[in-house]
Amino acid sequence: MAASSASTSAIQQRVWQGRIPLQIVLSPSECRIYDQSDPYIISIPRLSYLPFILPRLFSFFSSSLIDPDVQAHDGWFSFEGVPLKWHYPVGLLYDLYAGAEPITSKSLSSPGSEREHYVRGGTRENISESGAEGEKDDNHGHDHEFKRDALPWRLMVHFHDWPEQDLIRLDPEGKILHDAFINSVKEADCLRNGTAKRIMALSKEDSSGLWKSVEEHNLPAYHRIHNTLLLPTPPTPFRNIPIRIFLPAPPDSPSPSLKVIQSPIPPLIQPTASPSSSISSASRQMQPQVQTIGTALNSLLPSLFPSKRTPMLAKPVLHGAVVPMSAPVEEVVKCAGYADGWLGVVVSMVG
């Protein structure tokens, strides 16, 4: 059963309220007093991007920098020695690298859990609200204690030694970051509608307004442009779901690289009648089935998700929360997609 418009808007608002506290230090090799400079503390929206705070960081650390000629756009971030891709939202980077245990509906029901959830960087709303009515998930058997030392997320900022093999350089005007975002929006639009005509038809004012709404973290302005002008007009369904599955490298991996799975996923699973089926059985099978998180993951990663209903070996994590396997993918992307229109699901191993 599709989530109501009010429910979708409420969950989207909760997702936009999600924030992550950061503690950022200057690279000791670039600091006049080595590792003795004060850290920069900030709470940043999960849907935001790290380069947005580079001007503030540059101003804060400028008196400690050895090289007076570096500029704000020379900055890049690392976590435990791994360069962080600046075109990924902060929340996605945190889910990928910080290693905190994701929230489940069971942990949210425990005393004090809502505050714990907000403090450790998740969204207040349980994404299961977008799940199909009448279905039940077994997401509760793999809960763990919170990793309380995961926040604030401790990052390092550098203004020298740009990792050319890992990151594309930024520019003073922010055009490269803007173009990367718009290109991602175009790709998502093409998957949703079968064409990128909607975003290509946006006026210059609306195109600039979409980017500005992300920079300023302005949900009403974003909602007016993205949800009104780019999403298919109801009741027209999505052609495909813009979804990326992120597989972090295993602990014993020689490199910190991650694998990204991306494939067209339709919102409905078309029926396939078996030759041996009875007429009544075949009639039931001829009805399209709603594509859920579980069916999508089973299709893309059957070895990690052998069951379409139960997270036996791995869990799908979105915005710091475990997504119910029965949640319809189209409803999830409408209410919990990132600002570029994509679902960024992180695979977290069970146990």
UniProtKB/Swiss-Prot annotation:
The gene is ATG5. GO terms for molecular function: Atg8-family ligase activity. This is Autophagy protein 5. Conjugated to ATG12; which is essential for autophagy. GO terms for biological process: autophagy of mitochondrion; cellular response to nitrogen starvation; piecemeal microautophagy of the nucleus; protein transport. There is a cross-link at residue 186 (Glycyl lysine isopeptide (Lys-Gly) (interchain with G-Cter in ATG12)). GO terms for cellular component: Atg12-Atg5-Atg16 complex; autophagosome; mitochondria-associated endoplasmic reticulum membrane contact site; phagophore; phagophore assembly site membrane. Residues 113-143 have a biased composition (Basic and acidic residues). Its main location: membrane. Involved in cytoplasm to vacuole transport (Cvt) and autophagic vesicle formation. Autophagy is essential for maintenance of amino acid levels and protein synthesis under nitrogen starvation. Required for selective autophagic degradation of the nucleus (nucleophagy). Also required for mitophagy, which eliminates defective or superfluous mitochondria in order to fulfill cellular energy requirements and prevent excess ROS production. It is a peripheral membrane protein. Belongs to the ATG5 family. The keyword Membrane applies. Conjugated with ATG12.
